[in-house]
């Protein structure tokens, strides 16, 4: 604690003082609430809603509303909120993060702000990390809200759209972060307003907020469809990758070494940089790849795909590990969440990495996907009017919460003092010695019937320890991504006397570990960490599983100098010191230098990871601004707005653009190129050919005016072909939806390509981020122009007798199997396919060489 904190208290202490009087007020209302009958207590909800309509604010109602929920929870669940839980509730209502230690009843705390904010009728989302917790909390805590007359919903992965819509319409909805994000993206791909499932994003209370907003912030949510690319190249590159030899480099290639012209010697065919998770081919490796594929120069643009795929294959073999990063189950590669140890069904690595791993594991290589819609959690949760979070561990990441999400972290005191003892780390020279020591510690605790929870980072380690304990005859349970179905049950029994549980990372987070009498007497739950995680926060979460609500317990981490953290980020000098001391086998090393080296390494990685996430956000911010514009425009179409004015603006913009592009002010009118003007404008707006005679003696602005009038008149003639004006209005909406979706998806793809290639700009002494923004905006402008041109071309060429339904829009996205919206037959254009166009059947051949040939034949 620094001098200022000693004098004035920490930020949390100062904030808690401010709300003390509010908490006192809530507690003083207790007798008043106790005196009410169930019916009268329930009637309070109607009273509060009326008072809101009369002009009172949520803050005015807070003391009474909280006192109401407190009394309702006591009657329905037999649980009354402690004073510290009331404090937590106020912090959450204020849109901040409440750091509450494990076992302090975060789930019960959420009922307070959820009830208060639900009174506005705009919806409250309580966000959990998995379906099990969403369902459990909705059933358990939902009883309190239902008792008070509010509706409670839960959205689960298995639900159809109609069910989801009903659940989101409830006052309070329990839902996982993944379902929320994917529903948001899917809502921006629907073709009828009636198919939307979500309401506006109003207020979110995020449970395990650090897991959602920090750990998962590096993985964007992606909805994808299949692209037409063949998967053969992945298999071929996998064969080659197995033949290439890993080498070493004498230094790191950086911008500085390139400028200084420093020589770096490399051995082998490729170099792996484990710190930054990058693989590079050496000169020797490049020659081998060129010989293998019979190509002259791997760096040529036409060989970009080979280059990309061989790097992917090498990454799959050297940086992605089975039972650590992914598991293979039922002939499928499934990603394991590195922070929770849980399988992430439905998620696939993007950019072809997943296919490279499938080729490595000899399972069916599924076609590479094309991104249809994507968003990061950072940008998604920032869309809420107000958001709050709860977790046991957030203070170490306070800066990130404040900078990126605008939320400060308030540490809530525990209800009872923590009685857990956190022992110094036990460090050994090798992993082998470390695991022996872990088994000994488990054995010792097991003999006195003390329950033990062993935390591992990888599935591999959990299985190795399991084998070692079996040899010692110690009965135990293993909890990792392979057995996640039994997760909650295994965790719930982990605190019983004599039980030994091995779990990867924080599997089972959110399920309380309760002690029985026997385990209390034996010293409470003993936590053993087998490796330090990259983040101190994850280590603290593991420790926090023990010592809940003042229970006894102890925790200790067992490390070795061979652990990844020490190997990659620890100082080599330090390693050499201990090696030169000649530590005997199985002897524990204890040294202040060592403890501070571990702490430094973790801080270094945390800073590094924060940098990666901040960088990702800065790039995604560009996508986000563009996404907002497109989704807003799309929603206008969906809401059934009359698009006539928008179409007329497109017509005038297109004419302006064409005239500005072809006719220059600096050139004499005699030199204006009529042929070019006709070839630019007439494919979009089928005007009569423009001749020099037509515009004789006119200035450029007069030409614009004349062409605009002709184009508008032509469109009015098209309108007159339709018996009812609404037929054309609906047609405009259909075509706009289809074109926006098509162009936006292509744009997402182009942005991906731009993002991957932008790093090379750094070598050209230009700031990659600035370049990315400039190019992205140029691309966006081109996309908007393309949307306008394609929309007009289709509308001007539409024929009344063609009947095609709005469902054709869904074929663009390949999603939307929902049939809950109304279906009206409308007129629609059918795009002509020319002989040299790609064949619509998706074969990748030209139309004349595929289906076109069949028609001719």
What are the residue ranges of the model-derived segments?
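Extended, charged helical/alpha-beta scaffold domains that provide interaction surfaces
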Residues: 326-334, 340-348, 549-550, 557, ...
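Intrinsically disordered, compositionally biased charged tails
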Residues: 254-260, 472, 823-832, 850
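Short Cys/His-rich zinc-binding micro-motifs
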Residues: 829-848, 852
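Conserved P-loop NTPase motor core
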Residues: 1-582, 631-632, 649, 653, ...
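Active-site-adjacent structural elements in folded domains
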Residues: 110, 438, 824-826, 834
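Hydrophobic, well-ordered secondary-structure elements that form the walls
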Residues: 454, 502, 744, 780, ...
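Short, Lys/Glu-rich amphipathic helical modules
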Residues: 449-462, 639-641, 692-696, 840
């Amino acid at each position: 604690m620094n001098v200022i904190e000693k004098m004035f208290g920490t930020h949390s202490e100062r904030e808690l003082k401010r709300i003390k009087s509010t908490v006192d007020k809530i507690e003083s209302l207790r007798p008043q609430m106790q005196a009410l009958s169930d019916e009268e207590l329930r009637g309070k909800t109607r009273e509060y809603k009326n008072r809101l309509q009369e002009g009172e604010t949520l803050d005015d109602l807070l003391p009474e509303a909280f006192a109401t929920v407190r009394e309702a929870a006591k009657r329905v669940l037999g649980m009354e909120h402690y004073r510290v839980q009331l404090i937590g509730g106020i912090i959450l209502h204020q849109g901040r993060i409440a750091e509450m230690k494990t076992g302090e009843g975060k789930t019960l705390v959420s009922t307070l702000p959820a009830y208060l904010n639900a009174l506005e009728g705009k919806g409250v989302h309580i966000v959990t990390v998995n379906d099990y917790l969403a369902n459990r909390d909705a059933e358990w805590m939902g009883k309190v809200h239902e008792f008070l007359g509010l509706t409670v919903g839960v959205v689960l992965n298995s639900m159809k759209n109609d069910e989801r819509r009903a659940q989101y319409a409830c006052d309070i909805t329990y839902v996982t972060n993944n379902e929320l994000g994917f529903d948001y993206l899917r809502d921006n791909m629907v073709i009828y307003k009636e198919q939307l499932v979500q309401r506006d994003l109003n207020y979110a209370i995020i449970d395990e907020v650090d897991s959602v907003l920090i750990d998962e912030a590096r993985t964007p949510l992606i909805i994808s469809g299949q692209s037409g690319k063949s998967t053969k190249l992945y298999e071929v590159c996998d064969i080659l990758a197995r033949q290439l030899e890993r080498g070493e480099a004498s230094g790191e290639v950086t911008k500085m070494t390139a400028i200084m012209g420093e020589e770096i010697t490399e051995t082998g065919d490729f170099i792996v940089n484990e710190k930054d998770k990058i693989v590079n081919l050496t000169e020797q490796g490049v020659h081998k790849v060129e010989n293998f594929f019979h190509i002259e120069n791997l760096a040529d643009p036409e060989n970009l795909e080979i280059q990309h795929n061989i790097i992917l294959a090498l990454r799959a073999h050297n940086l992605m590990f089975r039972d650590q990063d992914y598991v293979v189950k039922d002939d499928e590669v499934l990603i394991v969440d590195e922070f929770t140890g849980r399988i992430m069904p439905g998620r696939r690595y993007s950019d072809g990495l997943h296919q490279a791993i499938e080729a490595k594991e000899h399972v069916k290589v599924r076609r590479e996907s094309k991104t249809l819609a994507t968003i990061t959690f950072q940008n998604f949760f920032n869309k809420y009017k107000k958001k709050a979070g709860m977790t046991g561990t957030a203070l170490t990441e306070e800066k990130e919460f404040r900078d990126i999400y605008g939320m400060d972290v308030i540490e809530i005191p525990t209800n009872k003092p923590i009685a857990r003892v956190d022992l110094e780390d036990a460090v050994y020279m090798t992993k082998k010695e470390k695991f022996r020591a872990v088994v000994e510690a488990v054995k010792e605790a097991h003999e006195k019937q003390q329950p033990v929870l062993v935390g591992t980072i990888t599935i591999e380690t959990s299985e190795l320890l399991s084998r070692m304990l079996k040899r010692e005859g110690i009965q135990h349970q293993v909890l990792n991504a392979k057995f996640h179905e039994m997760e909650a049950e295994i965790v719930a029994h982990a605190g019983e006397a004599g039980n030994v549980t091995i779990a990867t990372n924080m599997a089972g987070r959110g399920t309380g570990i309760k002690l029985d009498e026997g385990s209390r007497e034996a010293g409470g739950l003993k936590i053993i960490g087998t490796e330090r995680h990259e983040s101190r926060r994850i280590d603290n979460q593991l420790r926090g599983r023990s010592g809940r609500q003042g229970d006894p317990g102890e925790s200790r981490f067992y490390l070795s100098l061979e652990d990844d953290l020490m190997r990659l980020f620890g100082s080599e000098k330090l390693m050499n010191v201990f090696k030169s001391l000649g530590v005997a086998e199985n002897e524990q090393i204890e040294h202040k230098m060592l403890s501070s080296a571990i702490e430094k390494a973790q801080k270094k990685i945390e800073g590094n990871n924060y940098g990666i996430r901040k960088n990702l956000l800065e790039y995604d911010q560009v996508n986000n601004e563009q996404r907002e514009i497109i989704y807003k425009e799309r929603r206008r179409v969906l809401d059934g707005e009359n698009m006539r004015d928008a179409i007329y603006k497109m017509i005038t913009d297109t004419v302006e653009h064409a005239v500005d592009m072809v006719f220059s002010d600096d050139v004499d009118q005699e030199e204006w190129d009529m042929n070019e003007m006709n070839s630019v404008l007439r494919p979009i707006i089928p005007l009569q050919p423009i001749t020099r005679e037509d515009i004789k003696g006119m200035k450029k602005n007069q030409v614009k005016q004349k062409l605009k009038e002709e184009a508008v008149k032509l469109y009015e003639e098209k309108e007159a072909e339709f018996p009812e004006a609404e037929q054309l209005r609906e047609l405009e909406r259909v075509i706009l939806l289809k074109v926006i979706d098509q162009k936006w998806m292509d744009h997402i793809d182009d942005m991906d390509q731009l993002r991957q290639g932008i790093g090379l700009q750094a070598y050209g002494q230009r700031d990659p981020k600035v370049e990315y923004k400039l190019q992205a905006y140029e691309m966006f402008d081109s996309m908007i122009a393309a949307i306008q041109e394609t929309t007009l071309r289709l509308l001007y060429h539409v024929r009344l007798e063609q009947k095609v339904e709005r469902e054709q829009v869904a074929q663009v996205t390949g999603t939307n199997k929902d049939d809950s919206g109304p279906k009206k037959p409308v007129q629609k254009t059918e795009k002509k396919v020319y002989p040299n166009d790609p064949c619509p059947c998706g074969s990748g051949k030209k139309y004349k060489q595929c289906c076109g040939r069949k028609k001719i034949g």
